[in-house]
Amino acid sequence: MGEDKREIKDITDLPGVGPTTAQKLMEAGYTTLEAIAAATPQEVSQATGIPILTAQKIVDAAREALNIDFKTAYDLKIESMNIKKITTGSRNLDELLGGGIETKTITELFGEFGSGKTQICHQLSVNVQLPEDKGGLEGKAVYIDTEGTFRWERIEQMARGVGLDPDEVMKNIYWIRAINSHHQIAIVDKLFTMVKNDNIKLVVVDSVTSHFRAEFPGRENLAMRQQLLNRHLHQLMRLADIFNVAVVITNQVMARPDVFYGDPTQAVGGHVLGHAPGVRVYLKKSRGNKRIARVVDAPHLPEGETVFAITEWGIRDPE
């Protein structure tokens, strides 16, 4: 008789995982069945030193235990009914996004400095805590800060703006400063345990590319940079999909020298970043406190743009 997959509740229940192997897996950030099932055998082997064939068996067993298999289109339709949305605070912006920021996907906000990327991330970290009938998910947020842009004072203002207790709101935002690209990747690996065991509904990475660009400059380092960035983005995609959370990443822009007409700016990160997010939103400055948002890539949304405002109390529609 084979081992009943329903008996596998923890990584220590997986066939071939004794105390030593379990310790290696946990030290590498693979602390849950979901984290192992979402990884490739190569990733597990490289991170732990476990032989590739053993890693293959462990990953296969984790996937079988979680019943990762083919689904019908009807199954996907039923699953889509579980997708939730977080209000941005601006009705205009919500309508552009089809109702708000979706769970089970990555939303990328890209634009130049001062275009509103970090402001929206702060607002979402507050709004995710609202009741569902007010556009929230009654959940907590994780804020991975790579550039030191997080401000608790701004959270305080925004919390007051939506009628929530600022101190209670701040207690429900887990902030961490990522010091380099490998630390950033390790943080996301750890989130597979955090998200499973806590009521986390939003993960923010602000910004997703800055460390990778700084640490791997030049064309000679491009392949390594893109490989690491690809792994990082796929972990975020798996996190969003497995746990039904919203993932929001910010990104910088650069000018394309080959564009002579129209807007020459594009998001950094190349094709790797271009394929990962489910929704890509380009933000631009306008007059005063107004900003322009344009959906540039989303399979379920039409391309379009709208105007929102950054006010004392947060993201709002312009007056």
Swiss-Prot record:
GO terms for biological process: DNA recombination; DNA repair. Changing residue 214 to V: In strain: OH3. GO terms for molecular function: ATP binding; ATP hydrolysis activity; ATP-dependent DNA damage sensor activity; damaged DNA binding. SUPFAM superfamilies: P-loop containing nucleoside triphosphate hydrolases, Rad51 N-terminal domain-like. This is DNA repair and recombination protein RadA. Keywords: ATP-binding, DNA damage, DNA recombination, DNA-binding, Nucleotide-binding. Changing residue 289 to S: In strain: TB2. Belongs to the eukaryotic RecA-like protein family. Involved in DNA repair and in homologous recombination. Binds and assemble on single-stranded DNA to form a nucleoprotein filament. Hydrolyzes ATP in a ssDNA-dependent manner and promotes DNA strand exchange between homologous DNA molecules. Pfam families: HHH_5, Rad51. The keyword Protein biosynthesis does not apply. ATP binds at residues 111-118.
